[in-house]
C-alpha cells in the first residue's frame, strides 16, 4: 500500500479545496439537477420518508449517503463539502489507476466544452454511479476481494437500478472460468440489498418504491426519449471505438464494464449523459496509453486557466445571493429580481402554495423556504410509477383553496428534451383562475368546490 506521506496529504488537501470551489463557484452554471439531488437528501434530513412523502425514481443509496453530510446542517455548503470529499476519494483511485496520466484525465474533466465534462463532478446518483464503477475497475485490475466487489455492485444497483443492474452482469465473465468468484460476489451483493430491503420494509415504503422505481420505468423511457444530434454522433464514435477494443481484447473485463455503463445515455442522449459516459471512456483509454512524462505542473496550470476563463466568460450580469439553506447561490440578476417579486406577493397573500414549475426550480423554492418536499415537486413523466400521469392529474384535481405557480415558458415549450408533465399545467389553467403574472410566473388560484 502506498505510504500516505506529507506530500500526499498536501496534494489531496489542495484537490479537496479546488473541488469545493469548482462546485460552489467555477462550474456552478453546469449544476444541472443539483437542487433536485440535494433536495432528496434535504428531505431525508427533514425527516421525510422517500417514496411515501415525496417521489423518487431511484433506489435510496445515493440520497441516504448524501444526507449523512447534512447531519449537522441542511446548508448546501455541507452538501458541497461532502461532494468535495467524495471527489477527493475519486481522485485517489484515478491516481491509482492512471499514475502520472491522472493529470491529463483531470484536464479532460475540467473542460466545459465541447461536451460538458465538468457537469459530471456535481453531486448526485450519476456521479456515484461513475465513482463506484471506477473503484470496481481498480479492484478488478488488482484482483482484490470478490466479496468487496459484490458489495460495491450491490451499492451500484441501489444507486441506479437500471445501469447498476446491468453493470452487475459483467461478473458473468467469470461464471464458467471461476464460478466461486461469482458466488462470492453474489454473497457480497446481497448484503446492501438486504439492508435496503429492511429499510424499505420498516419505513412502510416497499410497495411505493417498487411502483416508482420499477413499474414507472415503462412510462419513463417511453415518454422521455430524446437525442441531440451532436452528442449522438459523439456517442456513436466512442461506441465504435469501444466495440473495436472488445474485438481486439476480448479478455479485458474493463471493456465490458464500459459497454454496460454506456446504457447511462438512454433515454436522454444529450450533453450531461454523454459526458458521464465519456468520463469513464477516457479513463479506460488513458489506462492503456503509454505515457511516463510528469505533466502535473502543466496540467495544474491548464486546469486553473480553464476554470478561471470559464468563470469570467459565463458570470457576466450574475450575482451571489444567500438564501436559507442555499448560501452562495449564483444567478442572473433578472432571475433574482423575479424570485424576490414572487416571494413578496405570495407572502402578502398568505395562502397555501404549490410550485408546479420545472423540478429543479420547485426544489429551489421549497429548500430556500425551508419547506417539506412533496409529490408535486418533481412533475416529470415517469416519476409517478405505473400510470403516473393519471396519478398526478388526480392529485391536482383534488386541490382546493390553494395558489399554484406555473411557468409560462413551459406552456408553449416545444423542446422535446423537456420532461415536464404538461397535462398537469393544462388542468391547472382549466380549473384555476389566473390572479397574477410576475415575469414568466403565472399564479392560479384554485378555490373551494361547493
List each model region and its residues:
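Short periplasmic/luminal acceptor-recognition loop of GT-C membrane glycosyltransferases, typified by
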Residues: 57, 317-323, 329-383, 391-414, ...
Amino acid at each position: 500500500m502506498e505510504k500516505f506521506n506529507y506530500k500526499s496529504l498536501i496534494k489531496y488537501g489542495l484537490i479537496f479545496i479546488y473541488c469545493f470551489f469548482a462546485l460552489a463557484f467555477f462550474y456552478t452554471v453546469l449544476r444541472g439537477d443539483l437542487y433536485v439531488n440535494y433536495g432528496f437528501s434535504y428531505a431525508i434530513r427533514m425527516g421525510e420518508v422517500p417514496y411515501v412523502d415525496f417521489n423518487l425514481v431511484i433506489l435510496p443509496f445515493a440520497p441516504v449517503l448524501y444526507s449523512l453530510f447534512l447531519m449537522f446542517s441542511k446548508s448546501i455548503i455541507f452538501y458541497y463539502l461532502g461532494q468535495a470529499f467524495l471527489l477527493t476519494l475519486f481522485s485517489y483511485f484515478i491516481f491509482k489507476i492512471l499514475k502520472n496520466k491522472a493529470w491529463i484525465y483531470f484536464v479532460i474533466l475540467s473542460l466545459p466544452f465541447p461536451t460538458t465534462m465538468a457537469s459530471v463532478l456535481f453531486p448526485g446518483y450519476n456521479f456515484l454511479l461513475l465513482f463506484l464503477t471506477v473503484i470496481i475497475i481498480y479492484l478488478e485490475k488488482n484482483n482484490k476481494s470478490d466479496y468487496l466487489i459484490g458489495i460495491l455492485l450491490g451499492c451500484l444497483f441501489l444507486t441506479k437500478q437500471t445501469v447498476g443492474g446491468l453493470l452487475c452482469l459483467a461478473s458473468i465473465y467469470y461464471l464458467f472460468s471461476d464460478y466461486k468468484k461469482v458466488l462470492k460476489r453474489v454473497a457480497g451483493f446481497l448484503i446492501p440489498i438486504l439492508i435496503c430491503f429492511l429499510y424499505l420494509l420498516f419505513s412502510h415504503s416497499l410497495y411505493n418504491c417498487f411502483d416508482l422505481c420499477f413499474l414507472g420505468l415503462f412510462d419513463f423511457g417511453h415518454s422521455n426519449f430524446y437525442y441531440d444530434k451532436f452528442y449522438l454522433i459523439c456517442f456513436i464514435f466512442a461506441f465504435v471505438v469501444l466495440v473495436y477494443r472488445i474485438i481486439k481484447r476480448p479478455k479485458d473485463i474493463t471493456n465490458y464494464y464500459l459497454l454496460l455503463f454506456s446504457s447511462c445515455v438512454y433515454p436522454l442522449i444529450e450533453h450531461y449523459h454523454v459526458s458521464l459516459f465519456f468520463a469513464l471512456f477516457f479513463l479506460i483509454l488513458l489506462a492503456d496509453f503509454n505515457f511516463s512524462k510528469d505533466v502535473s505542473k502543466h496540467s495544474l496550470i491548464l486546469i486553473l486557466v480553464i476554470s478561471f476563463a470559464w468563470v469570467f466568460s459565463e458570470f457576466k450580469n450574475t450575482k451571489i445571493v444567500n438564501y436559507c439553506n442555499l448560501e452562495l447561490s449564483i444567478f442572473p440578476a433578472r432571475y433574482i429580481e423575479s424570485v424576490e417579486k414572487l416571494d413578496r406577493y405570495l407572502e402578502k397573500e398568505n395562502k397555501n402554495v404549490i410550485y408546479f414549475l420545472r423540478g429543479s426550480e420547485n426544489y429551489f423554492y421549497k429548500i430556500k423556504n425551508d419547506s417539506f418536499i412533496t409529490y408535486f415537486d418533481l412533475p416529470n413523466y415517469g416519476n409517478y410509477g405505473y400510470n403516473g400521469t393519471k396519478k398526478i392529474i388526480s392529485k391536482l384535481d383534488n386541490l382546493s383553496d390553494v395558489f399554484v405557480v406555473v411557468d409560462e415558458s413551459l406552456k408553449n415549450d416545444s423542446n422535446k428534451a423537456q420532461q415536464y408533465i404538461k397535462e398537469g399545467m393544462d388542468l391547472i389553467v382549466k380549473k384555476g383562475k389566473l390572479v397574477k403574472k410576475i415575469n414568466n410566473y403565472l399564479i392560479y388560484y384554485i378555490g373551494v368546490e361547493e
